[in-house]
Amino acid sequence: MTARDSASSDITPEMLLRAYACGIFPMAESVDDPTLFWVEPEQRGLIPLDGFKVSSRLARTVRSDAFTVTVDRAFKAVIDGCAAPQQGREDTWINRRIRELYIGLFEIGHCHSVEVWQDDELVGGLYGVSLGRAFFGESMFHRARDASKVALVHLVARLLEGGYALLDTQFVTDHLRSFGAVEVPRRRYRTLLDAALKDDARFDRLPIDAPVSGAQALEIIAARPTPKR
């Protein structure tokens, strides 16, 4: 389900948070489109935190600390990286107004970024919205192999450590399925979201201003509760 809003300049970060609490998020047709439209998918993408999968090859890359991973250090650069054309994704849904809104959410502590660096160059990352015990992954990018995957592993470790209950990916791609992403019907999603919004989580339970090693991130993921059957 979608609904177009031509008065996107009237939307505030606080209004955006209320939309997320209702299971709705904004997109744009293209970077040049001045308007937004609201989306509430019939089937919602999630990565169950207790079912997150890390391949052996990726685990070796994460453990090697070949990349330096930081948090909330270069938010604007990450959102710009996500908005830039990439192979297989020549266009973007991140227009100027979306950029402004999410920077606004970052400034009030409800949006976060994970940055991946190689030799002091930003080569990957992701950003998303934090509300209650829910984290809404918005977009990711990479300029080096596995950089966005490493960012996702570090994000999941941080969410687990911080007491999050829901990782919303909005949609499911083959890439996300390899990490355990699933689709759930809208009604089921709303039940999960409502439960996640009853309490608060701590994105900064792991330090924001100090590095977390790949080995530490993998240990946190390995220690998560066993999925219920």
From Swiss-Prot:
<keyword id="KW-0808">Transferase</keyword>
<dbReference type="InterPro" id="IPR004616">
    <property type="entry name" value="Leu/Phe-tRNA_Trfase"/>
</dbReference>
<comment type="function">
    <text>Functions in the N-end rule pathway of protein degradation where it conjugates Leu, Phe and, less efficiently, Met from aminoacyl-tRNAs to the N-termini of proteins containing an N-terminal arginine or lysine.</text>
</comment>
<dbReference type="Pfam" id="PF03588">
    <property type="entry name" value="Leu_Phe_trans"/>
</dbReference>
<dbReference type="InterPro" id="IPR016181">
    <property type="entry name" value="Acyl_CoA_acyltransferase"/>
</dbReference>
<comment type="similarity">
    <text>Belongs to the L/F-transferase family.</text>
</comment>
<dbReference type="GO" id="GO:0030163">
    <property type="term" value="P:protein catabolic process"/>
</dbReference>
<dbReference type="InterPro" id="IPR042203">
    <property type="entry name" value="Leu/Phe-tRNA_Trfase_C"/>
</dbReference>
<protein>
    <recommendedName>
        <fullName>Leucyl/phenylalanyl-tRNA--protein transferase</fullName>
        <ecNumber>2.3.2.6</ecNumber>
    </recommendedName>
</protein>
<keyword id="KW-0012">Acyltransferase</keyword>
<keyword id="KW-0963">Cytoplasm</keyword>
<dbReference type="GO" id="GO:0005737">
    <property type="term" value="C:cytoplasm"/>
</dbReference>
<dbReference type="GO" id="GO:0008914">
    <property type="term" value="F:leucyl-tRNA--protein transferase activity"/>
</dbReference>
<dbReference type="InterPro" id="IPR042221">
    <property type="entry name" value="Leu/Phe-tRNA_Trfase_N"/>
</dbReference>
